[in-house]
């Protein structure tokens, strides 16, 4: 709710009405396409985990593997960071795999995904560092420092929150160190399956980014956003998700603040952020809800 409060602080009532009108005008075909791509990413994530389970000597049910991913994200929307525990428990109970090993494989997945996101971040910086630096050092930003003090304050708050979040995870990282090692072992045991695992990991991120990119075309006013800004804005959104329940509130705000540095109006950035977040949230709630209902039935019948 803190980030919703910040959003209300940086927008006027007229701007909020404008954002809502933009969202209502979104073309449904692009929204459906974005939701489908987001769902594909989560489905592929479930399929990818099966390679890790086989690497440690366990077979897993495909529906359970995929359903656990949606359940994970649904849980995160209710209780931050609870999803991994829910997913590990589901995979352990329904596939008859020791929970320590499921934690290990999930930790391995996390490390792979973080590595990919950091790689994309570095790539964005190398390809567009001149544009990024120019946007923050041109006359519109630093020369009007007094007018941008609120923006600077909010960016500082986001950075502090990220630092606090990272520090809070240090102890948990120590606790799950053995599980992470187990996960690494599952990666090394992939052997000839490693190329397929890498391809699936790449497809996950391609789908996520494509969903973010497609939603830009759903509202005519979003055309003002240069395509070269979409990838860095996507990465900003990715790193902001961990700051609240599945990125609620902070995801659109982070994207808006980033685009504001490039002269994109706040209402445009928030429209893009809320549309992208909502598409993924709807998919998560629908398929997550179905998974919470269907998976226990499958387990009972099994």
What are these regions (language model features)?
Residues 1-69, 127, 131-241, 264, ...:
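Predominantly cytoplasmic-facing regulatory/coupling regions of multi-pass membrane proteins
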Residues 219-230, 250-274:
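Extracellular/periplasmic helix-loop-helix junctions in multi-pass membrane proteins
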Residues 66-93:
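Hydrophobic, aromatic-rich membrane-embedded alpha-helical segments
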Residues 71-80, 232-252:
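Transmembrane alpha-helix interface/packing and boundary motifs in multi-pass membrane proteins
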Residues 84-93, 245-261:
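Re-entrant/interfacial helical elements at transmembrane boundaries that shape
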Residues 121-129, 256, 260, 292:
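Juxtamembrane/transmembrane-helix interface segments of polytopic membrane transporters
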Residues 71-79, 103-126, 275-286:
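Membrane-embedded alpha-helical segments of transport systems
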Residues 62-65, 82-84, 97-110, 265-275:
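Membrane-interface alpha-helices at helix entry/exit sites of multi-pass transporters
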């Amino acid at each position: 709710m803190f980030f919703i409060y910040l959003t209300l602080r940086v927008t006027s009532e007229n701007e909020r009405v404008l954002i809502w009108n933009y969202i209502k005008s979104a073309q449904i075909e692009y929204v459906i396409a974005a939701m489908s791509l987001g769902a594909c990413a989560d489905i592929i994530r479930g399929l990818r985990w099966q390679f890790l389970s086989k690497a440690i000597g366990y077979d897993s049910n495909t529906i359970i593997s995929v359903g656990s991913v949606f359940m994970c994200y649904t849980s995160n929307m209710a209780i931050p960071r609870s999803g991994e525990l829910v997913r590990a428990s589901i995979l352990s109970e329904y596939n008859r795999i020791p929970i320590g090993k499921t934690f290990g494989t999930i930790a391995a997945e996390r490390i792979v995904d973080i590595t990919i996101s950091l790689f994309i971040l570095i790539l964005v910086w190398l390809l567009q560092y001149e544009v990024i630096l120019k946007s923050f050092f041109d006359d519109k930003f630093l020369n009007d420092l007094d007018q941008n003090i609120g923006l600077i304050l909010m960016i500082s708050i986001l950075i502090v929150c990220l630092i606090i979040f990272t520090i809070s995870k240090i102890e948990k990282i120590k606790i799950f160190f053995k599980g992470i090692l187990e996960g690494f072992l599952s990666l090394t045991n992939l052997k000839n399956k490693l190329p397929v695992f890498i391809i699936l990991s790449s497809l996950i991120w391609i789908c996520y980014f494509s969903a973010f990119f497609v939603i830009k075309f759903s509202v005519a006013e979003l055309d003002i956003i240069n395509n070269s800004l979409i990838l860095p804005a996507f990465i900003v959104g990715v790193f902001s998700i961990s700051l609240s329940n599945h990125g609620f509130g902070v995801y659109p705000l982070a994207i808006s603040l980033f685009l504001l540095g490039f002269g994109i109006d706040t209402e445009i950035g928030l429209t893009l952020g809320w549309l992208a977040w909502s598409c993924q949230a709807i998919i998560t709630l629908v398929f997550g809800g179905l998974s919470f209902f269907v998976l226990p039935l499958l387990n009972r019948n099994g």
